[in-house]
From Swiss-Prot:
NCBIfam families: PRK12797.1, yscR. Component of the yop secretion machinery. May have a role in the negative pathway regulation of yop expression controlled by calcium. This is Yop proteins translocation protein R. Belongs to the FliP/MopC/SpaP family. It comes from Yersinia pestis. Keywords: Cell membrane, Membrane, Plasmid, Transmembrane, Transmembrane helix, Virulence. It comes from the Bacteria. The gene is yscR. PROSITE patterns: FLIP_1 (PS01060), FLIP_2 (PS01061). It is found in: Cell membrane. It is a multi-pass membrane protein. The chain crosses the membrane at residues 11-31, 53-73, 157-177, 181-201. One of its GO terms (cellular component) is plasma membrane. It holds the Pfam family FliP. GO terms for biological process: bacterial-type flagellum assembly; bacterial-type flagellum-dependent swarming motility; protein secretion.
């Protein structure tokens, strides 16, 4: 397991731990879950239901389920190999071998065009001596490519979610206009029909199952 040899290394580790919330949000499946659920709430037209705590809580739970194999594999490595912060070689070995399952997860869910973009842009933006040293599976490439890929997929799913609800809004709006009820808000009338459609289609089950299965393979 990781050893903390002295106070200085402890301070360094604690400082790095402050980055964990950012990594947990942007470098895991959480980002796609959270964006899709937010788009669903907007499509339904209910800005406060479900509340943020419930929505993000569900995203966290599903992300823990999806990311669990990566965590288990990393834990197995730490149990089988001693990682000391005073030993640079052991730290480098951990980043090379211990994080291999995580890098594999990122690779499996990166769109090819995003990966190619960040590989090519590195050669243009970074100084040559640093760009030449950068490996193709470096986290400097995988993390931004993964995040952009996840956001792209989330918005694609959000677009498909929006379509049936927009149709309901248009139908209700036209009916109200035909009845001369221009002062009545179409959103107020269409909301029950949106909820009914979502419930009849077993929306939560289909959506969550589809999102989880998208990380298969």
């Amino acid at each position: 397991m990781i050893q903390l040899p002295d106070e200085i290394n402890l301070i360094i580790v604690l400082s790095l731990l402050t980055l964990l919330p950012l990594i947990s949000v942007m470098a895991t499946s959480f980002v796609k879950f959270a964006v899709v659920f937010s788009l669903l709430r907007n499509a339904l037209g209910v800005q406060q239901i479900p509340p943020n705590m419930a929505m993000y809580g569900l995203a966290i739970i599903l992300s823990l389920y999806v990311m669990a194999p990566v965590g288990f594999a990393t834990q197995d490595y730490l149990q089988a190999n001693e990682v000391s912060l005073t030993n640079i070689e052991s730290v480098e070995k951990f980043f090379d071998e211990g994080l291999a399952p995580y890098r594999m997860f990122l690779k499996q869910h990166i769109q090819a065009q995003e990966y190619s973009f960040f590989v090519d842009s590195t050669k243009q933006l970074w100084p040559k001596q640093y760009a030449d040293r950068l490996e193709s599976d470096s986290l400097f490439i995988l993390l931004p490519a993964f995040t952009v890929s996840e956001l792209t997929r989330a918005f694609e799913i959000g677009f498909l979610i929006y379509l049936p609800f927009i149709v309901i809004d248009l139908v209700i709006s036209n009916i109200l206009l035909a009845m001369g009820m221009m002062m009545v808000s179409p959103m107020t009338i269409s909301l029950p029909f949106k909820l009914l459609l979502f419930v009849l289609l077993d929306g939560w089950t289909r959506l969550t199952h589809g999102l989880v299965i998208s990380y298969g393979g």
